[in-house]
């Protein structure tokens, strides 16, 4: 069972409970038993599942709940809280300080440590964005081609690197590399080690020696989410050998069961700091347990959505966009810009899962590529339009001759141009419903949480989505998140210094 399916099963169990007339012990037990089965089938270890069930029953004591309490809501919150605890041990990972050398050592199972093509360059991109001066040391002398791969990734990312084609002692190479980069004032030195299994005693001893020699400030355990039921024992073996302080999970792209991931996090008692959701660099992201579980259960992650949006929309354009929103003005040029922003935000499936009431698996396999291709076709057609056409807010400007000219210029057929214009009309109608939002002219995102603005926005949302986020009160809460300007977590779970 993939993680997306796990989320669907848990949501289904909660929905069945919500449909019961009276919430009693039987209704609660039926719900928890279904969730338990789903977790076990997803390879979550039995002790972990049993502990979760026990904790929920301690929190939700139906006999002690006074009349008038929303039992359904309390049960849902308890389930959410316990799922978050599985992925968040409540510890903050080490946060490196700029201009002060910090050593980070990567360990993991054979076939995982820095072998996934997007892991090194993706992480380095995030590191450099935060103003660090990183360097890479290849202490993997076990795997053929390890140094070549690290060298290629480092060169591509313009990151200094150290390794040896002739040396066979990984401890010596690691120490030499760390010493060199400390002298060069690199403030984040990443040491890549060989992948290993708990059965390989010699490689575990090698890992311990590298750790003792380089004295890393942080040891990161890299794991593949498809590892399955052995995850708990493997992760515990690493934790018992070196001081694992953080976890990176790869292949969280929906093809693996993923439940072993929850077990491994519990075994290391260390926070997850990054997850890889695909094969590309934009599919590697900072991890936060609460938004992740919220998306898993179909409740979305509006703060994450807004953060992504703010990354792709230049700051100087944000007030202008909000002002046009408040006046209900929507042109093809605006639609073009928003399509571009959508593509820049990363995989549509991930963006889709951030919206309340939606889940990643609701976008069928293959549909994501089809949707992206359609957006690009629409943009190609708009590239064949004049400035007058792009800036007009009147769809009637497109007569037959203009439509034929656009079709010829973009290499598309007339029917496709008509389809694109119909989509524009639909979005224009939706945009018009939020006309009149107050206090947005100066880019004041917090104004979205005002009562009148929330009422205006509720007209745009589908009824099912509005219900999913908790009606008007839930919408106002989401709008407050959007306007809060909440900072992203620090690079390794802490804050930037």
Swiss-Prot record:
Top-level division of the source organism's lineage: Eukaryota
Similarity annotation: Belongs to the GTP-binding SRP family. SRP54 subfamily.
HAMAP family: SRP54
GO MF entries: 7S RNA binding; GTP binding; GTPase activity
Entry-linked PROSITE patterns: SRP54
Species of origin: Arabidopsis thaliana
Quaternary structure (record): Component of a signal recognition particle (SRP) complex that consists of a 7SL RNA molecule of 300 nucleotides and six protein subunits: SRP72, SRP68, SRP54, SRP19, SRP14 and SRP9.
Function: Component of the signal recognition particle (SRP) complex, a ribonucleoprotein complex that mediates the cotranslational targeting of secretory and membrane proteins to the endoplasmic reticulum (ER). As part of the SRP complex, associates with the SRP receptor (SR) component SRPRA to target secretory proteins to the endoplasmic reticulum membrane. Binds to the signal sequence of presecretory proteins when they emerge from the ribosomes. Displays basal GTPase activity, and stimulates reciprocal GTPase activation of the SR subunit SRPRA.
Annotated region (M-domain), positions in chain: 298-497
Gene Ontology terms: cellular component: endoplasmic reticulum; signal recognition particle, endoplasmic reticulum targeting
Any single GO BP term: SRP-dependent cotranslational protein targeting to membrane
Domain notes: The NG domain, also named G domain, is a special guanosine triphosphatase (GTPase) domain, which binds GTP and forms a guanosine 5'-triphosphate (GTP)-dependent complex with a homologous NG domain in the SRP receptor subunit SRPRA. The two NG domains undergo cooperative rearrangements upon their assembly, which culminate in the reciprocal activation of the GTPase activity of one another. SRP receptor compaction upon binding with cargo-loaded SRP and GTPase rearrangement drive SRP-mediated cotranslational protein translocation into the ER.
InterPro entries per the UniProt record, alphabetical: P-loop_NTPase, Signal_recog_part_SRP54_M_sf, Signal_recog_particl_SRP54_hlx, Signal_recog_particle_SRP54_M, SRP/SRP_N, SRP54, SRP54_euk, SRP54_GTPase_dom
Annotated EC: 3.6.5.4
EC category: hydrolase
Binding site for GTP: 108-117, 192-196, 250-253
Chief location of this protein within or outside the cell: cytoplasm
Protein name as annotated: Signal recognition particle subunit SRP54 2
Location of this chain's protein in the cell: Cytoplasm; Endoplasmic reticulum
